[in-house]
UniProtKB/Swiss-Prot annotation:
InterPro entries: OxalOxred_beta (IPR054952), PorB-like (IPR051479), THDP-binding (IPR029061), TPP_enzyme_TPP-bd (IPR011766). It comes from Moorella thermoacetica (strain ATCC 39073 / JCM 9320). GO terms for biological process: oxalate catabolic process. Catalyzes the anaerobic oxidation of oxalate using a broad range of electron acceptors, including ferredoxin and the nickel-dependent carbon monoxide dehydrogenase. Does not require coenzyme A as cosubstrate. Enables anaerobic growth on oxalate which is used as energy source by the bacteria. This is Oxalate oxidoreductase subunit beta. [4Fe-4S] cluster binds at C24, C27, C52, C225. Optimum pH is 8.7.
Amino acid sequence: MLDRIASIKKAPDEEYYVPGHRTCAGCGPALTYRLVAKAAGPNTIFIGPTGCMYVANTSYGCGPWRVPWIHAQITNGGAVASGIEAAYKAMIRKKKTDAEFPNIIVMAGDGGAVDIGLQALSAMLYRGHDVLFICYDNESYANTGIQTSPTTPYGANTTFTPPGEVVPEGKKLFPKDNPKVIAHGHPELKYVATASIGWPVDLMNKVRKGLNQEGPAYIHIHAPCPKGWQFPADKTIEMAKLAVQTGMFQLYEYENGEYKLSVKVDKRKPVSEYMKLQKRFAHLKPEHIAKMQAFVDARCAEVGITVPVVASNA
């Protein structure tokens, strides 16, 4: 069992995702990997479907992992993890190894968890494999040129959703809510959570809680992307915090059919305070932002966030 971390000063000193990779400055997914690896510890195997954290971390001489890591296709992270888990259990059962059963963690981007890789993820969860599946969500297919994904927000300017005369808002669709898809579609699943790099202790404790579960668990981690979202690289943590403070991303755990909020928010900032700092939303008109505000209000209400929206200068 992995113990709860009381504070950031009590977090493990050891690093299992170390410098030497080629991620962008201010990369949210890189910080996600660092925190997850720190929480999980040395007895861990990572499965990395194709995505930013595969492309930026696997050039010759640039591998940042101090624990075993295996590449999977973007479609099959859940299947590869299922095979590793089954093989370890078989070897232990047949006394072919005396090694302790490892922490098996899939680290997939939103493409590998919410879109192309959803089928293998769902099958892994349904079969009950003892695996923690984590989505690091940077809200686009970023390593191939910032294409839209199912988690890209409404109104975002991406290479596949450029704003123009016919479609002035850019992306017309609202984002898929994958944590709820997972939670409500897999009734035997014991633990679903969301996390943010803006709250590192909460993130690490959720990783440990997910690993301590018997059977599978799913954690969806919000990981801002300076390049894709078009904000300064030194503002990544500010963006992560604003996403939660505005309700654009909600922090909670889902257990026993109930949502438990992770961060107390007395009032929410309007989504405009978050969106105005990202050039991917620079083309939006007030009516588009109002549409996004209404959508966020509804999503917040679904998990029990009912506090009023109050502007910072109010």
